[in-house]
Amino acid sequence: MNLSRRDFMKTNAAVAAAAVAGLAIPVKNVEASPDKIIKWDKAPCRFCGTGCSVLVGTQNGRVVASQGDPDADVNRGLNCIKGYFLPKIMYGKDRLTSPMLRMTNGKFDKHGEFTPVSWDQAFTIMAEKFKKALKEKGPNGAGMFTSGQSTIFEGIAKSKLFKAGLRSNNIDPNARHCMASAAVAFMRTFGMDEPMGCYDDIEKADAFVLWGSNMAEMHPILWSRISDRRLSHPDVKVAVLSTFEHRSFELADLGVIFTPQSDLAIMNYIANYLIQHDAIDHDFIQKHTKFKRGETDIGYGLRETHELEKAAKNVKTAGKMHDSDFEEYKKLVAPYTLEKAHEISGVPKEQLEALAKMYADPKLNIVSFWTMGFNQHTRGVWANHLIYNIHLLTGKISKPGCGPFSLTGQPSACGTAREVGTFAHRLPADLVVTNPKHVEKAEKLWKLPKGVIQTQVGYHAVAQDRALKDKKMNVLWQMCTNNMQGGPNINQERFPGWRDEENFVIVSDPYPTVSALAADLILPTAMWVEKEGAYGNAERRTQFWYQQVKAPGESKSDVWQLVEFSKYFTTDEMWPAEVLAANPEYKGKTLYEVLFRNGQVDKFQVPTDKPGYMNDEAEHFGFYLQKGLFEEYAVFGRGHGHDLADFETYHKARGLRWPVVDGKETLWRYREGYDPYVKEGEGVAFYGYPDKKAIILAVPYEPPAEAPNAEYDLWLTTGRVLEHWHTGTMTRRVPELHRSFPNNLVWMHPLDAKKRGLRHGDKVKISSRRGEMISHLDTRGRNKVPQGLVYTTFFDAGQLANYLTLDATDPISKETDFKKCAVKVEKA
């Protein structure tokens, strides 16, 4: 399809008006007459984890247009407001185009001015700092904080560079802040990660329950599908649970506002209701589940010196699960009566009972969706377990229109962070560094000698901040994220370590973000279709795209940076002498040679039959790097329930949902007739465990790490708005998006405002025990908060909401709780 740039701008005007109003519309409703000026190709959207496919229009070496891909199953030609403005994210006036090092008089100076340097100069000082830190502080002396926005190829390269080449597992993604609890609970419940269902469930479900998920703004294309299902089928029901009222409530038949943290009590009440009313599937439970009891009083992931950690009894065994049975489970949930759930949550009894009846109805196909409200939670793993319990008790799982569905917030939090394994403890395809057999397999598939990959887990995201501050770690490379703005407790735990004289911080980014400006070295990065890439979305769908334009100036893709940087190290410098003595063929080689010129990664050449094909990495390195990385990686999962198709298939398709066996994708896992790994006659097989049974886990309600008191008398919860994505690095550089929502706000109940002598629009100071932020008050807008709670966002670099947040984490998953801390608000 072809569309002129002028006509595209007309299209955008109509689209913007509709999207700001909360609509998602297909391009065919607004497009003008076609011509042959613009070249079109497909790519997945750069933003959330939905995985919409867009058609990208290029002209004269620039991206000038985009539109929803009508051939894509996910979005069916629709885009949300952010998707329609994708071309503009790449052309901000302050785009970085050369490496920048802090220097004074031609030498590195921690307090110097950012000065352009060559890539060789940048990598030389980086290598020097890495070698020194790893030698002096051990494998965790240097590390990387990376992203669920990195491509699959970039994830493979960084995992190999750190875990194999540098022999450091000290690499963790920002997905630790958003998806770790979901991933851990998947692994603990089913023995395998990621959802069993897919987006096709939406058109087959009779009821939807949203737990801590504002899909109307955060996953608007999926919300459009739910809206269509609800509005075209009168009997379909929607329940929305949250700590405040947001736009998703507009469609809700049952809108539930609960006290922060009390979702744990509500879910235990539902489980108790199901048992008391014999609304459970006894046959399913007997055949396909087993019972465990979780450890309790496990702390809050704070520093060991914190009073809450010292008081907790089971911090060291937080993840332990004890054998149990149905009778003990029944006894443990019995205290969660309607009265107790109401008392803890503040939810009216009739609403609680109505919700329980939705799950109890055997005729109702039901899907539970959740996002950060569940995961960014000091008991996030428990919350995920508790929703699985409900679906397992009723047998409403792993079949069309029925199941628990964890939605991801980033385009490849699944495909890269989880599947590739860029967490500090993971390897590809659900393998972990602490399992010697898994390590042995990784060494074999990566053609490495035994003993190269270490079994010591690296620092998780929050621990990296603490280690840098405490000087246990001296080098940090941040890639494809903005943690100085997006991570918790900036004042006390992050900024001090970044600016410490002994530490060296590198940031790879296309723009001068808050993180970049706090770093010592900035590396300019290619964006989106300036490189060839691949993402994996929330429904296990892997999608590829080709490079379509070149990056500006000296900007390089992250995969180029990682692979080129590997040339600055030798095995003699980084690997143990005994390993090299036993394997002399590796001695004296660069990490580039052993990791990326190993006869596997470098065995493919770029296609010669594709007119206009470009691949800057292949041109530089002399081989088809992306294909080599992917095919080497894909071997990890083939035959083990993580099967991926071959490389070329993905470039032809609009994505495929794994496992892909004999060329066929899998829509519903663990169910006979849909999943090729479930044998005939098994019906359901949760084959992540040898006994093929899923775990139902008994865990209680426990209070949050911090709650309001006389001084800090309000709950604070943080999140996003429709128009902006995460820290606004891209969306705030789109003029239309910036104008539609220029600055952050603090939403407050009108009575709370009146009590403080405040009015809508007032300039206010919001303070916590950790810091403060100046903003403006909103008592009338889209978010309607209950008394006692305020809501704010983190997209605005001029208002750093994470000055306020607490760095408490789930003790099992190590995921941060951005949803609950105590603040006070006063006139500024």
From Swiss-Prot:
Molecular-function GO term, any one: molybdopterin cofactor binding
Modifications made to the protein after synthesis: Predicted to be exported by the Tat system. The position of the signal peptide cleavage has not been experimentally proven.
Gene3D superfamilies in the record: 2.40.40.20, 3.30.200.210, 3.40.50.740, Dimethylsulfoxide Reductase, domain 2
Cofactor binding remark: Binds 1 [4Fe-4S] cluster. Binds 1 molybdenum-bis(molybdopterin guanine dinucleotide) (Mo-bis-MGD) cofactor per subunit.
SMART domains: Molybdop_Fe4S4 (SM00926)
E.C. no: 1.9.6.1
UniProt key word Electron transport: yes
GO cellular component: membrane; nitrate reductase complex; periplasmic space
Enzyme class at the top of the EC tree: oxidoreductase
Residues binding Mo-bis(molybdopterin guanine dinucleotide): 82, 149, 174, 178, 211-218, 242-246, 261-263, 372, 376, 482, 508-509, 531, 558, 718-727, 802, 819
Binding residue positions for substrate: F794
Cofactor(s) recorded in Swiss-Prot or TrEMBL: [4Fe-4S] cluster; Mo-bis(molybdopterin guanine dinucleotide)
Subunit structure: Component of the periplasmic nitrate reductase NapAB complex composed of NapA and NapB.
Family classification: Belongs to the prokaryotic molybdopterin-containing oxidoreductase family. NasA/NapA/NarB subfamily.
Name this protein carries in UniProt: Periplasmic nitrate reductase
Organism of provenance: Pasteurella multocida (strain Pm70)
The organism's taxonomic lineage, starting at the top: Bacteria, Pseudomonadati, Pseudomonadota, Gammaproteobacteria, Pasteurellales
Protein's gene: napA
